Amino acid sequence: MGAARLLPNLTLCLQLLILCCQTQGENHPSPNFNQYVRDQGAMTDQLSRRQIREYQLYSRTSGKHVQVTGRRISATAEDGNKFAKLIVETDTFGSRVRIKGAESEKYICMNKRGKLIGKPSGKSKDCVFTEIVLENNYTAFQNARHEGWFMAFTRQGRPRQASRSRQNQREAHFIKRLYQGQLPFPNHAEKQKQFEFVGSAPTRRTKRTRRPQPLT
């Protein structure tokens, strides 16, 4: 009889315990993984090993390549120009990078007025850009400190005011190209120069003598 009386009480306690656990689970929502990725992508990664890539950036508007000649940044370099070779370092495990000129060793940065300048150190947030791959296969670079400000150049290859640049504008579109070094012909004059053939006296072709066939 005692066991029969305890059974309903145990069942009730078990039901109350299950209900309590369900209530606590509803009060604590599941973690948002996408938000976590966005938060971590906005922070500089000091633990992981940085990836380094080398390439050129072809400007859609100027038809030339981005070059870093010191403090000056422009998009007027020809393919293979030594100042057009860029070293791109990853800043986070996301798509944020730092861009440095291989020859000048200056980082592409953006000041508070939205002007592109070269700096010897790229540690500040002004020198960090977010790569955005567009639907037309071009790439845009948004400054990490000034959200909505993009790296952009005019048709003449001069930097455009970043506050007036937008992601969908041609001035902010770039194509990554492998750097293959200086071209075999450094200037147009030598490219047009014809090859010279080395002169030599003509050789006379001798007649081939045949051996007499043995008589059978």
UniProtKB/Swiss-Prot annotation:
Cellular component aspect of the GO annotation: cytoplasm; extracellular region; extracellular space
Region: Disordered, residue numbers: 190-216
Biased composition regions of type Basic residues, renumbered to the chain: 204-216
Taxonomy, superkingdom: Eukaryota
Sites where a glycan is attached: N137
Keywords annotated in UniProt: Developmental protein, Disease variant, Glycoprotein, Growth factor, Hypogonadotropic hypogonadism, Kallmann syndrome, Secreted, Signal
CDD domains found in the cross-reference section: beta-trefoil_FGF17
A Pfam family it matches: FGF
One biological process term in Gene Ontology: cell-cell signaling
Tissue expression remark: Preferentially expressed in the embryonic brain.
Molecular function GO labels: growth factor activity; type 1 fibroblast growth factor receptor binding; type 2 fibroblast growth factor receptor binding
Transmembrane portions of the chain: none
Primary location class: secreted
Signal peptide range: 1-22
Annotated localization: Secreted
Record family assignment: Belongs to the heparin-binding growth factors family.
Assembly and interaction partners: Interacts with FGFR3 and FGFR4.
Function as written in the Swiss-Prot or TrEMBL entry: Plays an important role in the regulation of embryonic development and as signaling molecule in the induction and patterning of the embryonic brain. Required for normal brain development.
Disease (UniProt): Hypogonadotropic hypogonadism 20 with or without anosmia: A disorder characterized by absent or incomplete sexual maturation by the age of 18 years, in conjunction with low levels of circulating gonadotropins and testosterone and no other abnormalities of the hypothalamic-pituitary axis. In some cases, it is associated with non-reproductive phenotypes, such as anosmia, cleft palate, and sensorineural hearing loss. Anosmia or hyposmia is related to the absence or hypoplasia of the olfactory bulbs and tracts.
Protein name: Fibroblast growth factor 17
